[in-house]
């Protein structure tokens, strides 16, 4: 059974994680625990309950804000003219040997579900992501994310409408 867990370096073997992108691998090993301790971001991993040490994928969440004029005309229409709060998924990675098997979809679903739960306590309009390239952008668009008007590789998903 796949489980989402908060990163715990005493349990999760970050050094063995390889998504094929050195900067995302290195972040998990070198910076993730530090960022969590400093309240810069929270890091969540996807594991198999039979082997919780093996990280199948991870994502980070932090607070963000966005100017409404950057949103699509449809979303912008009923919002205030000042910056609004959002969530930012700063990093998102799936183990290279599992890519294309639905792990990314599961992990993204976990992130959206978590945002919806947090949103019950702290208002936030959307989940923001920054795609590294057009292939990654297409992945997010498939799940309903919309590009910002002025930043085509930055996207958002309005949540909880």
Question: What are these model-derived regions, one by one?
Answer:
Residues 1-34, 38, 54:
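Short amphipathic alpha-helix that is part of the acyltransferase structural core
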Residues 39-63, 70:
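Conserved beta-hairpin
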Residues 51, 55-57, 61, 82, ...:
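Short Lys/Arg-rich amphipathic alpha-helical segments
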Residues 58-91:
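Conserved acyl-donor/pantetheine-binding loop and adjacent beta-alpha core of acyl/acetyltransferases
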Residues 90-100:
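A short, internal acetyl-CoA/4′-phosphopantetheine-binding micro-motif in the GNAT/acyltransferase core
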Residues 108, 133-136, 152-159:
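Short glycine/proline-centered loop/turn elements that form peptide/ligand docking sites
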Residues 116-117, 122-124, 130-150:
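Conserved active-site alpha-helix within GNAT-family acetyltransferase domains
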């Amino acid at each position: 059974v796949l489980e989402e867990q908060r990163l715990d370096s005493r349990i999760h073997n970050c050094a063995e994680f390889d998504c094929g992108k050195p900067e995302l691998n290195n972040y998990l090993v070198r910076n993730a625990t530090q960022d969590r301790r400093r309240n810069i971001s929270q890091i969540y991993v996807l594991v198999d309950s039979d082997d919780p040490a093996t990280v199948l994928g991870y994502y980070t969440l932090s607070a963000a804000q966005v100017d409404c004029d950057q949103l699509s005309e449809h979303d912008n229409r009923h919002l205030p003219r000042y910056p609004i709060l959002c969530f930012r998924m700063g990093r998102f990675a799936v183990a290279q040997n599992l890519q294309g098997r639905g792990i990314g979809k599961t992990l993204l679903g976990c992130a959206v579900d978590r945002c919806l739960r947090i949103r019950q306590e702290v208002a936030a309009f959307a989940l923001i992501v920054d795609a590294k390239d057009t292939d990654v952008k297409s992945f997010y668009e498939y799940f309903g994310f919309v590009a910002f008007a002025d930043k085509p590789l930055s996207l958002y998903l309005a949540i909880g409408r």
